[in-house]
Amino acid sequence: MEAPPAAGVPTECTPAVAGAEVRCPGPTPLRLLEWKVAAGATVRIGSVLAVCETAASAQPAGPAPARAASGGCVRAARTERRLRSERAGVVRELCAQPGQVVAPGALLVRLEGCSHPVVMKGLCAECGQDLTQLQSKNGRQQVPLSTATVSMVHSVPELMVSSEQAEKLGREDQQRLHRNRKLVLMVDLDQTLIHTTEQHCPQMSNKGIFHFQLGRGEPMLHTRLRPHCKDFLEKIAKLYELHVFTFGSRLYAHTIAGFLDPEKKLFSHRILSRDECIDPFSKTGNLRNLFPCGDSMVCIIDDREDVWKFAPNLITVKKYVYFPGTGDVNAPPAARETQARRKVNHSSKGGDALEQALSVRDPEDGRPAPGVEHSNGLGKASRELNGGEAVPGVFPSKADEKEAWPLTRASPASSSSGHEPTEAPELPVSCEWDGRTTPGVQPTQGDAATQDLDFDLSSDSESSESSSRSEGQRAPAPQERTKAAPEHSGPQDTSGGRAAASPLGESGPSIHPHDKGSDLDTQEEGERDSLCGLGNGSVDRKEAETESQNSEQSGVTAGESLDQSVGEEEEEDTDDDDHLIHLEEILVRVHTDYYTKYDRYLNKELEEAPDIRKIVPELKSKVLADVAVIFSGLHPTNFPVEKTREHYHATALGAKVLTQLVLSPDAPDRATHLIAARAGTEKVRQAQECKHLHVVSPDWLWSCLERWDKVEEQLFPLIDDDTRTHRDNSPAVFPDRHSVLPTALFHPTPIHSKAHPGPEVRIYDSNTGKLIRMGPQGSAPAPSSAPLNHGEPSSFRAVQPHQQQMFGEELPESQDGEQPGPARRKRQPSMSEAMPLYTLCKEDLESMDKEVDDILGEGSDDSDIEKKKPEDQDNEQERAPKPRKPRAPGIRREQPVGLPSSGERSTPGMRGPRGHKRKLNEEDAASESSGESSNDDEEGSSSEADEMAAALEAELNDLM
């Protein structure tokens, strides 16, 4: 029988940890026969507290022998009953003795309610109560107050413990670390130890690159391990307890951890992903849960400071970039928006609307529509990527694994063994055969090549390194590719081989590059496009099962698609990143300094225990302790220098930042280093005259930060010709290093040496559009309207010495004995020759001219031409004796009637500006109209004709 709730039972607003009282139930008295619990015992709901008996004639008062004298009628009426608890808790006090008769409603037991110190997915691990299904009388949900608020297990955020128990566990962890002389190291993945991209770069070597998929239909991910990564982890693991903390998804984090630590000796279960993050924009919120006693023994390495809120125990790592155009694929949304302004990312895969607007989720990490950014290497919906509606802490079951990973299945032995997935020979991912590309894969590689041209890298050094790596590596030979194919023909299978062949379908020698490539590529792209728009469809269902696959799928779903025989023949990898070597030295210094102070603390030489949050800034501030720096050109003059990144890191390294340049070597506030962005500023010119002042580039400061050491200033000199280099590379300026004086880009008129016979020239009436004259070009030289000075330097269109060979076949040969003059100067190249990309070719222009001539010449007939001939003769005879000023070049009117003239602008090598033809037609029309008026008006004097001609000439000269 269950005791009814007494008056002392906690109400809805009373905390569950308050004491509860169990009273005697029913309207009849009970005799207590036996207690089933003792003081301090833990009871659950339904646990038996005591065994009682009831008697109808039993009297609650009087001595026991007197009550027993009533005889067997009482014994016959009594019935044993079990008193059960309807609450969980700990027995605080037993309020009755065995054999005592308890009146109805009398107090029997005082209980201390369960505080639910350990809760797993809403169930109390102590009392078993479901804390999510309690309903109050009025229908509102009544959730008992639980003290379990701390999640201490990395990959199981649903397991909560109380703060008291968390502190107890935290103290035990600290004692264990002190016994083992270790510290804690929080390790970031993306752009710290690895670099991941969705883009396949066939030009790059496959050495050290893992190719894998996180799910069926998901895009292939390519991960490159940073050089010296595994050696770094193995050495540091002897001094630090390694914890992984990444903004990638849980499956992504465990997969990468399987590459770095296949035997699970380095990280074990200490892997924290985005799915367990309390704050999606910061990593500091989880430190309180993981280390309830404080993070005084925790050191952090990450390439970004903002996600840690510039924590003092953070060691900033140089960003690792191997794939050009890709930053941190798992950066938080705030960093995506920043990186989207600097990058242009065109991807062929679709994504959700949020990620299309935010670009990268790293660094360095949304996507600009219609492209796709590499958020965690997946085209998932934003709700799932941020842990919206997906159930955290779950993984596909083994039944669903066979369906979800058909292309990456492997035996459990291969994944659980201590060997890396690179030991079995596999098919290479790239599909080049005999120097040709598989037709089905060619569009994908073409897109990748287009993306390489559109990407805007964050720095020039990264761009140059990536381009040099791409150029220096080649694809494996076709013979080596064919050798690897028969090895997969048997029933044996490896995870790496499946993962490597997954982009192409099923692995095996049956794949032919010409008959299967197109179909497989079409099928793959169709699956990707259809699955990328599903939102929370199959992926949510896949994550809503169980998390029992944490350790298995990291080795099953992915593998390094490297054929060892192919890798031996490839060129050496040109990735010379050695930052982890310097980072190892820094971590060793931190570890040594900590335990040196800890030993002194044990000997009571120090009053307080050492703290990593004080040791890291202390060691860092000694790097540039004797340096005073001043900045030039790194930030706008109206921007406070204290808010710049250079000022933050310079002061963190111990340098003193000055704002005024003091040139006196004896001044106490003089600067020792000038960090300038460009040469030519006033500060740089003054500093270069001082021998005691080092003028360096900003790379010197970043190198000191990366190594925690003062590097040599001679390695980072300030380049003096930064401005000149930028001016020469400008597309708007033609390079002319031989000219000294500033010159104009274009001359008003071209200068021709002499006339050359051309095919033909046609002259049309500007008013009627009819053909006036056509014929071969004459040999009369064209006078120059504005001859150049001989001493004038060459301009944009002048032929440079290195360009004379280019135009040598078209330059006229000078005659012997002739004096050089304006008419004999070598011609300048035309627009089509100097800038061929900005003009049409000669054949196109000639075909356009002929087409226009045919259209305009259809209406003209022979009578019109013959009618114009006597008028032209009269006009030329009248104008012949008159003194004339030199005409603009390219205008010819001195041709006799019988000899048709030709213009030199039709000559391929002598093409002039296009406006000359229009101006020639205008002059012809004006001359003809003036000739007609002179014939009609015989009284007009010659002086008026001269004035009109002079005015016309002046107007033409102004136009030219």
Swiss-Prot record:
Mind naming one GO cellular-component term on file for this protein?
protein-containing complex
Which SMART domains does the record match to this protein?
A: BRCT, CPDc
Positions where N-acetylmethionine occurs in the chain: M1
Compositionally biased tracts (Basic and acidic residues): 865-881
Q: Which NCBIfam families match?
A: FCP1_euk (TIGR02250)
What are the protein's UniProt keywords?
Acetylation, Cell cycle, Cell division, Cytoplasm, Cytoskeleton, Hydrolase, Mitosis, Nucleus, Phosphoprotein, Protein phosphatase
User: Where does the protein end up?
Assistant: Nucleus; Cytoplasm, Cytoskeleton, Microtubule organizing center, Centrosome; Cytoplasm, Cytoskeleton, Spindle; Cytoplasm, Cytoskeleton, Spindle pole
The record's listing under Gene3D superfamilies reads: 2.40.50.100, BRCT domain, HAD superfamily/HAD-like, S15/NS1, RNA-binding
Q: Cite the post-translational modification comment.
A: Phosphorylated. In the presence of TFIIF, the phosphorylated form has an increased CTD phosphatase activity. The phosphorylation is required for the physical interaction with GTF2F1.
Q: Does the keyword Acetylation apply?
A: yes
Organism per entry: Mus musculus (Mouse)
Q: Does the keyword Coiled coil apply?
A: no
State its Enzyme Commission number(s). Answer: 3.1.3.16
Region ranges (Disordered): 331-580, 770-834, 854-948
Role, per record: Processively dephosphorylates 'Ser-2' and 'Ser-5' of the heptad repeats YSPTSPS in the C-terminal domain of the largest RNA polymerase II subunit. This promotes the activity of RNA polymerase II. Plays a role in the exit from mitosis by dephosphorylating crucial mitotic substrates (USP44, CDC20 and WEE1) that are required for M-phase-promoting factor (MPF)/CDK1 inactivation.
Enzyme class label: hydrolase
Record-annotated FCP1 homology domain positions: 178-341
Its name, as the record gives it, is RNA polymerase II subunit A C-terminal domain phosphatase
Q: Which residues carry this modification: N6-acetyllysine?
A: K770
> What reaction does this catalyse?
O-phospho-L-seryl-[protein] + H2O = L-seryl-[protein] + phosphate; O-phospho-L-threonyl-[protein] + H2O = L-threonyl-[protein] + phosphate
Tell me which residues make up the BRCT domain.
Answer: 619-718
What residue spans carry the Polar residues bias annotation? 439-448, 547-556
Q: Where is the sequence biased in composition, kind Acidic residues?
A: 453-463, 566-578, 854-864, 934-947
Q: Which GO terms describe its molecular function?
A: RNA polymerase II CTD heptapeptide repeat phosphatase activity; Tat protein binding; TFIIF-class transcription factor complex binding
Provide the positions where the record notes the PTM Phosphoserine: S530, S664, S730, S830, S860, S863
Chief localisation class: nucleus
* Quaternary organization: Homodimer. Interacts with GTF2F1. Interacts with WDR77, SNRPB and SNRNP70.
